Amino acid sequence: MRSKLFLLSVILLICVSCRHKKAATDKETVTTENTYTNPLLEYGAEPWAIYHEGKYYYTQGSENKIILWETNDITDLSHATQKEVWIPNDPSNSYHLWAPEIHRIDNKWYIYFAADDGNMDNHHIYVIENVSANPLEGEFVMKGRIKTDKDDNWAIHASTFEHRGERYLIWCGWPKRRIEAETQCIYIAKMENPWTLSSDRVMISEPEYEWERQWISPDGSKTAYPIHVNEAPQFFESKNKDKVLIYYCASGSWTPYYCIGLLTADAGSDLTDAASWKKLDTPVFEQQPEDSVFGPGSPSFVPSPDGKEWYMLYHARRIPNDAPGATDSRSP
């Protein structure tokens, strides 16, 4: 796994769940000065961060609000400044605030998140905006819900990026409203502005391999119906910028089989053409039971302060899966 990531020029901040660990030798000196300890917080799913003018701004999923953390050190979140920046007051988007992401676009701050009215079948993507220089100051205001297709299908896990002068949105959505089973796929579209799409959605990945379609945990616990998952897409570029990379998560997040897959496209190709994308047939990051790391996923990437490395944030569990009704034990 590590070799795959390095071949793609990604230098990751990865915990003991790497498949190929290098043992220390007597010629190596290990100090605590530049080390970190996982997990970074006791609890928290769907971690996401951005680095801007010497500060990291971090956020994670919640049930009913959005919190931002501000810190000089992304590995020291427990001592970061925190602020609640969004508490919804519209019943249609006041529940299950999943996978918030903060982006700096045209000198304004935007947070993308999914929310619903209490019924998770009604999840949609929303965008809020803050014109202040610091996102912990000023006020976020609702820009609206992103309508992702003409049928207004279920949509979560939105992320945005700019490539060669064009802004794109990538997200997880349903091909159509579920009946007896559910399939979650990765979509892409061009954007007119940070809260409006300018092209039709195009599916670039669906769960096809066995490792993408796991929904039953080893202890037999499962959802009420089959759910096959591709979700949480994240943009990255190869070192020489000749490839566009989309990391995404596969299989049910409630299982230990949750993992990270990879899509690639040539940088000069039409990113809204499904034929431009190729999928690796094995995950690039997955559970490591011997180290008690299960279901790693929901990646995001931030640079080190000196710009020499890239860090990957992700969540995982220390147990295979949570018992029904138990507190979510995922942590970043």
Regions found by a protein language model. Name each.
Residues 1-28:
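Bacterial Sec-dependent N-terminal signal peptides
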Residues 18-332:
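Carbohydrate-active catalytic/glycan-binding domains of CAZyme proteins
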